[in-house]
Each structure stands twice: as structure tokens, then as C-alpha cells.
């Protein structure tokens, strides 16, 4: 009866009815998946800023130009690159309280990529950003840069002390609130002695 009492939407009621103490009472017999467009041309960059606030101030530049992905990494996240083979930048040069935006554009036409490789670095530099690698279109180099973001969780997990567990929290905010949120999270982690905490996420989506 809880399924009917606790939920209003028919799909929620159904979902809570099909799995119960007696087992699963329904299953998917057929699934139809739609493919998504995968443009053949991609260019990527990593832009460093002296603070989270500066990085978030530059986010609209990337969003308005149609960036397909924008990831925010705090200083602790950026330093995990030291555990990768041949990191694309020197992780020991990352300053305290700095942050970075890792971003990618996907296009169908060469002239679109050429425009972005000229306009984006210029716009980000005007906002105080530094692109140590410039814009990268080579697939192998892009993969190396993506591996920093994709490898964050396993890297942090592998560094934990014996007998400890990794704690993860997923938070969603308007990206305009992220500077305050990240700074307050850092203070909370420091207050409770989570000194090895890292903060990263999908900046364009505020997650």
C-alpha cells in the first residue's frame, strides 16, 4: 500500500509496485534507443584562473559560444594530475585557491573550429585566464586532458588511507552561485579536517 500512499504520479506508483518483497513483478521486454549527433571535429582547452570566482565569471563566454562540455576543477583536483603518466601541465605549479575550466567544442565544419581556436583564447585571456596548452584538436592530446577529469574519482580513491572510505556528495546550484558554494565547501572540509577533499563538476550545468 505504501506505493499508493507515498506517491502521486502514476509512474512513481508503478515503479514502486514492480519491486517488492516477493521479487520483481515486471521487466523491460524491449528498449528503443535514439542515437545522438557526434560531430567529427572537436577542439578542447584548459584555462587556469587565480580563483573560482574568476573561472565562473568566464563561464558565460564558453556557454554563449556553444561549448558542448565545461568542467570546473579546483586546485586540489588539478594537482591529482601528478599521479598520471606524462601530465599535460605541471601540477606542482598549481597555486592555492586557483581553479580551471576544461571545455570542449564539437563542430561539423573546419571554419567553425578555426574561428573558435582564435576567438576563445583571446576572450578568456581578457578575463584573466591562462591556457597553458592552447586549444587542442589532436585526439590523443584531448584524451590525455580528459583523463584528468575522468580519472579524478579513482585517483582520489586510490590515495585514501588504509581503513578509510571515499565520501562523495553531488550538489546542484545555479552556476552563478558556484564561487560562494565552492569557497564555503572548502571551509567546511577544512573545519572537519577533510584536508584531502577535491571539488569538481559540470560547471555548465551547475552540478
Question: Which residues are covered by each model-predicted region?
Answer:
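Noncatalytic alpha-helical scaffold of FAD-dependent oxidoreductases
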Residues: 1-207
